[in-house]
Amino acid sequence: MIDLFDFVVLSSFIILLPLVTDFLNNTFPNAKIGRLAQEVVGMILVFFIVSLIFAGVSLWYTHFLPFYYTKSLLISFDTLNLLDLLKFINTDNNNNSGSSIFNKITFYFHIFFTIQLVVNLYYYYYQTITADNFLPKISKNKQIQLFASETTTTTTTTTDNINEKKNKLCGLCDQVSDGKWSTINKPKSHHCRICKRCIDSMDHHCPFAANCIGINNHHYFILFIGYTVMALIYACYLSFFPYYHCIVNYKNYVSLSFTNDNDNDNNNNNNFKQLAQSCAKFNKYSFIFLCCCLIVTASFGILLFQTYLIITNSKTVQLLSRLKKSKSFLDWFKWLYQNFKQNASINNIYSLFPNFKFYNLIIPYYKRKINKLNK
């Protein structure tokens, strides 16, 4: 029977799989491995990401935060969760000791911090996976009317000008629709072969969102990645304590718990014994720390890459296209450096996050969507 630990480990590896397929697809573009994987597992990844956040909150509630405060006292409760922990802290706080008051303050901080993390994570992820970045479809009849009206209203229109405007129509959209409709290309628009539509200001097709990252959700995607990194760092911090006590130093605690050289060490030995028993109860959940480290490393890499894109006003598809044209990785890295020197500006960040305020670090940020006519 699969338990919460097995689900977290399974989800961690499943979520990381698209990174491998993307790497293979970009390194060997003719193989099209990544494209096939994204088409098949997109919504499955969404399910696992949503479920993994919920599983993380459950483990935080029932395991890691209680262990963070109680450690050796964990064994004294049959099932220890936040309600039991709150009673324990309030009871201990009656002593009015400095450490007890500090524990109570930090306990409420952990509660507040986790709630705002979860709210922001779900909000930004929802906005990322539901955003519509498609360029409007233009039917064959509308194309004829459009070019006919331009011909009649513009006295200087030539055949070459009309052909130039027709060339702005996406040929791939025309193929997908069997000539029934197409879209007019815009600067930085790109045809997604997975969505089979042209995306306004496309950055990339994200397998983790089963959606393209474009004009209406790029900012939400970056904020989601940022809060994911923040949540994972917090998870690494809390999960480190059971990993350290129950994996790294477990043998020492077991040996010390049965060492009674003198009466002065009896209390310490009892604490070590209780901690050893607590670790036995914690069991394999101590290894969650390793899963957190694995995912936070990958997420932080994505965040760094997206930060570069924001500062330089670049897109992932643009960088990958440049990579394919480069003779070597060294030439590509030189181009990345030159691109940073020429285009890096703090104004690029402001343009992507207009009206972003300091309080949006806690309260979710909202950016008005770009209206699309004649969709």
UniProtKB/Swiss-Prot annotation:
Annotated GO CC locations: endoplasmic reticulum; Golgi apparatus; membrane
Q: What is its main location?
A: membrane
Q: What are the GO MF terms of this UniProt record?
A: protein-cysteine S-palmitoyltransferase activity
Q: Which reaction does it catalyse?
A: L-cysteinyl-[protein] + hexadecanoyl-CoA = S-hexadecanoyl-L-cysteinyl-[protein] + CoA
Membrane topology per record: Multi-pass membrane protein
> Where in the cell is the protein located?
Membrane
Residues forming coiled coils: none
Enzyme Commission number(s) = 2.3.1.225
What keywords would UniProt list here?
Acyltransferase, Glycoprotein, Lipoprotein, Membrane, Palmitate, Transferase, Transmembrane, Transmembrane helix
Offer one example of a GO biological process linked to this entry. Answer: protein targeting to membrane
The record ties this protein, via Pfam families, to: DHHC
Would the keyword Secreted be found if you checked this record's keyword annotation? no
Q: Name the family.
A: Belongs to the DHHC palmitoyltransferase family.
The free-text domain remark for this protein reads: The DHHC domain is required for palmitoyltransferase activity.
Q: What is this protein called?
A: Putative ZDHHC-type palmitoyltransferase 8
User: What is the source species?
Assistant: Dictyostelium discoideum (Social amoeba)
